[in-house]
């Protein structure tokens, strides 16, 4: 399942076989474009998520605290923290909300004529989907294109258990989990419940701030 770069093509009713196609990062975003070699999938050994860094995302509906696991996703956590520390996520909106799937953000702001893509400022990163962390409810993971090593700034939070997104998933690559919600899961549930049109919130849910916390 890949998350497509085209923002409005996600179907409103999702079967398990099509849901993966919605996790692609929307927009240009500066991802890698090299053709990957075909992987030989082997299911990673599950690991316990360990919190090494903490981030608070303040949204227009409340705060979401994240515990990030640099022990198992060092590249992904370092990348996410760069965007947080740069203030990149301020005024970003949740551009995709699918109640029983994910809430996704990290690539769009609200302009006068609709959503405006915010170009990623760092190169795409290596995919760490084989780290043994699972796409369970409340975990945060990176969105990407169909190219495995293409994640930049866009992320999603799982609103339900989405183990079909784990490596190898249907595309052979999976999606990299790098943390979990430690406080504010009720805010995630508020976001997942907002009214949407073509999986885009009718009223913006905006990230007001994102910062590292003790």
Tell what function each PLM region has:
Residues 2-5, 9-11, 26-214:
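Cyclophilin-like peptidyl-prolyl cis-trans isomerases
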């Amino acid at each position: 399942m890949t998350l497509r770069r085209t923002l409005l093509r996600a179907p409103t009713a999702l079967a398990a076989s099509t849901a993966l196609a919605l996790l692609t990062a929307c927009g240009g975003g500066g991802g890698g474009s090299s053709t990957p070699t075909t992987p030989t999938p082997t299911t990673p050994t599950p690991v316990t998520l360990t919190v090494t860094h903490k981030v608070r995302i303040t949204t227009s509906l409340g705060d979401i605290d994240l515990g990030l696991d640099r022990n198992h996703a060092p590249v992904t956590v370092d990348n996410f923290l760069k965007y947080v520390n740069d203030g990149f996520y301020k005024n970003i909106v949740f551009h995709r909300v699918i109640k029983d799937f994910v809430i996704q953000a990290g690539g769009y702001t609200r302009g006068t004529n609709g959503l405006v893509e915010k170009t990623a400022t760092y190169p795409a990163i290596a995919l760490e989907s084989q780290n043994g962390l699972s796409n369970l409810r409340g975990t945060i993971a990176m969105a990407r294109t169909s190219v495995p090593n293409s994640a930049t700034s866009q992320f999603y939070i799982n609103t339900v258990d989405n183990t079909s997104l784990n490596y190898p998933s249907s595309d052979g690559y999976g999606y990299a989990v790098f943390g979990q919600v430690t406080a504010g899961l009720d805010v995630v549930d508020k976001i997942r419940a907002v009214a949407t049109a073509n999986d885009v919130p009718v009223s913006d849910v905006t990230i007001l701030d994102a910062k590292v916390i003790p």
